[in-house]
């Protein structure tokens, strides 16, 4: 895309800054189409911006960040229709945030492919076979969750790739499945992925616990969860009908402080509130 082309040119020319003009006021704390109270994030690190983009934030084409990151060139993301409004600066050493997280992003349509079996415990090379098989088929995996017992590995893919992924994995492990050592690959659709991102995740204990406590109090079950290798993101898979609710309760918890919005319905036969 044009963002990526601009990034390559900026890196080649050693530009002082890369400006990307889009239709929103930079990166937001959440999707403003879903969360009306979402607001602009003033600064992000390269890693934080990459995580948000990888999990659904469509402000910047994800590969755009790497060429300028290597040359330590800041990125300014501005709104073409609001040039004097708030914007986001992406740089290596972003100013520390006073909040526990920087932002929340989501992938609306997710399928979960699960490879499981007792024979996976302690066996070297099973995951290598899984990822090699999927890579050779051109199937991208954007989240991985493995059980502590090593008996199952769940992979988040696009719904369009889900059935094909199951078929080729069943073919790869056909011998183990025939022997009863592994189960046929399982596939679940109708899911969504949510990611909570911020460098403060690695510095503040209890943030992940708070996240799942909020989800639990609101009756939102989690199907799979993964902690990013850089310890600045937590991603999890939920039922798609619960996505909007999950985004709202998490945004309220982490960004709105003690402020709480209530939906109030009043009815009456006459002038409501007259007495």
Go through each PLM region and give its residues.
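Glycine-rich adenosine-cofactor-binding loop
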Residues: 262-275
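C-terminal catalytic "cap/lid" subdomain
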Residues: 1-260
């Amino acid at each position: 895309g044009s963002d990526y082309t601009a990034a390559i040119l900026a890196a080649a020319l050693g530009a002082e800054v890369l400006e990307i003009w889009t239709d929103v006021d930079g990166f937001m704390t959440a999707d403003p189409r879903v969360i009306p109270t979402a607001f602009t994030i003033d600064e992000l690190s390269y890693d934080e911006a990459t995580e948000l983009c990888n999990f659904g934030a469509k402000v910047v084409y994800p590969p755009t960040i790497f060429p300028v990151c290597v040359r330590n060139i800041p990125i300014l993301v501005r709104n073409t229709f609001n040039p004097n409004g708030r914007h986001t600066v992406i740089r290596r050493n972003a100013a520390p945030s006073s909040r526990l997280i920087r932002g929340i992003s989501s992938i609306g349509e997710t399928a979960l492919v699960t490879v499981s079996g007792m024979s996976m415990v302690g066996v070297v090379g099973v995951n290598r076979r899984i990822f090699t098989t999927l890579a050779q088929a051109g199937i991208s995996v954007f989240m991985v969750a493995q059980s502590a017992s090593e008996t199952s590995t769940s992979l988040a893919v696009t719904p369009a790739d889900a059935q094909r992924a199951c078929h080729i994995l069943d073919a790869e492990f056909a011998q183990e499945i025939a022997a009863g050592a592994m189960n046929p690959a399982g596939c679940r659709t109708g899911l969504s992925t949510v990611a909570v991102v911020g460098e403060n995740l690695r510095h503040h204990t209890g943030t992940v616990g708070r996240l799942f406590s909020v989800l639990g109090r609101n009756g939102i079950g989690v199907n799979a969860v993964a902690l990013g290798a850089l310890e600045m993101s937590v991603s999890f898979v939920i039922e798609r009908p619960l996505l909007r609710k999950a985004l709202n309760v998490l945004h309220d918890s982490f960004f709105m402080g003690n402020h709480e919005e209530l939906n109030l319905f009043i009815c009456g036969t006459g002038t409501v509130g007259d007495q």
